[in-house]
Regions:
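A contiguous loop/helix-start segment that scaffolds small-molecule binding in enzyme catalytic cores
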Residues: 1-8, 76-78, 153-289, 294-296
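Short gly/ser/thr-rich secondary-structure transition/capping motifs
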Residues: 11-18, 138-141, 203-205
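Class I SAM-dependent methyltransferase SAM-binding "motif I" and its flanking Rossmann-like core
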Residues: 84-157
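A generic local secondary-structure boundary/capping motif
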Residues: 69, 119-121, 145-149, 178-180, ...
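Long, low-complexity, intrinsically disordered segments
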Residues: 289-310
Length: 310
């Protein structure tokens, strides 16, 4: 048979406009679709006619992973779909661990819940941050607590995946208590539920006032660092910001502290003509120059990613 191809595809947080063009193309090209049933339901309108669809329930991760690999070994073009990004608390790592000899494998990134809720809240991930799952289904709870303590001692903005479920109720309060030992009571804490969905809910609070009961299985929680704050946008929205500490900010995010620049004040850019035609050969970019040009840049919605690991 023809050599099979397996794409492990991230669907993003659930809204169609955050499904990447590459992910959409891999889904439309696939002759075999596998995934957790709610994720498969998201893409039914774009699957090619005649494609085989394997939609399974939670708890069958091993079976659907094996089925996706086997279909690719039979020469099929397979899209194995996951919420958010496939490499973040999802199916990319078990797929690669299970073994993919004899097939071509591609991991197609997706907008993960952490990034989706960051955009919803403002810019809480503007500086160094940690991502921790509070589910002890696959990780020992003592190890999770060790990681929470490290994030607390390092003053990292901390995003909690899988913060609470029907049977896991003590984990989030325990984690918040550890963070509260190292951060002021006024530290911003926000919860986003059903991110990028019609029923999206946002609660912005502080470490001192936050109530774990606000959190459900479709939620994610972001706890700020000691420098995080709430600011008000021009359209009078409350936003969560962690300063990047750019030297030109002077330590304040206040419009009256900064000059109103016009284009005449900006340094003159190099006058370079860019061609729409890509170069014939790839160009090596110096890592230091790239880091400078990127200005030192550092994800299953809260409803999609939390289904990954409950």
């Amino acid at each position: 048979p023809a050599r099979g191809h397996l794409s492990v595809v991230g669907l993003g947080p659930g809204s169609r406009d955050l499904l990447t063009p590459r992910a959409l193309q891999r889904i439309q090209d696939a002759t075999f679709i596998a995934g957790y049933a709610p994720y498969v339901k998201q893409i039914r309108g774009v699957v090619r006619p005649g494609a085989t669809i394997l939609a399974t329930k939670m708890g069958t991760e091993e079976e659907r992973t094996a089925a996706a690999i086997e279909a690719a070994r039979e020469g099929r073009n397979v899209a194995f779909v996951c919420g958010g990004d496939p490499a973040i608390y999802a199916m990319a790592s078990p797929t690669l661990e299970m073994g993919t000899d004899g097939i071509d494998v591609e991991i197609v990134p997706g907008v993960t819940a952490e990034l989706a809720i960051s955009g919803i809240l403002g810019a809480p991930l503007g500086h160094d941050h940690a991502t921790i799952s509070l589910s002890d289904l696959h990780t020992d709870w003592d190890l999770i607590l060790k990681r929470v303590r490290a994030a607390a001692e390092g003053d990292l903005v901390t995003t909690f995946y899988n913060p609470r479920s029907r049977t896991r109720t003590h984990q989030l309060p325990d984690a918040l208590a550890i963070l509260a030992e190292h951060r002021p009571p006024s530290t911003p804490v926000a919860v986003v539920s059903h991110a990028e969905r019609r029923q999206q809910q946002i609660i912005m609070s502080t470490l001192a006032e936050f109530q774990p009961e606000w959190v459900g299985m479709t939620s994610m929680v972001v706890v700020g660092s000691s420098t995080s704050k709430y600011v008000t946008s021009g359209d009078n929205r409350k936003l969560f910001v962690t300063p990047r500490d750019y030297h030109w900010m002077g330590g304040a995010i206040r419009s009256d502290k900064h000059k109103n620049y016009s284009h005449r004040d900006l340094p003159k850019a190099d006058e370079t003509t860019y061609s729409a035609t890509p170069p014939a050969r790839s160009t090596r970019v110096d890592a230091a120059a790239q880091a400078t040009s990127d200005a030192d840049r550092p994800a299953h919605t809260t409803g999609t990613d939390t289904d990954k690991d409950v």
